[in-house]
Amino acid sequence: MIHFATRDERLRQFFGAYFNQDWELDDPDVPSVVDRYARDYEGDELDGESVIGLLVKDLRWLVETNKEIPSTDLWNITFDEYGSYYTGEFTGEDAHQWLQWVARRLENHLNKQ
């Protein structure tokens, strides 16, 4: 598996590859997408740190650095900058809370390793 060294590369890989325009054809729901990423990168390391753990930090960074902006703007960032075709905007999901949920779900996978 290719490992991406920078935060932006990892976020683009996660959102662009796993939440691409056809994500609903690959997986039945959002938890399944996140779980597939965790399976794909289970045990992988970059410079001695878990690839999944790095993404957890990246997701938390994304939330923290954008905590003052509206949820709609954060959904737009995940699309415009990172290539995500998932948005909970139409179901009323808050982007900040959703990203934290994704980070927690990935962290749970780490704790099982």
What are these regions (language model features)?
Residues I2, T6, D47-S50, L54, ...:
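Alpha-helix boundary/N-cap detector
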Residues L11, F15, I52-E64, L74, ...:
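Generic hydrophobic secondary-structure signal
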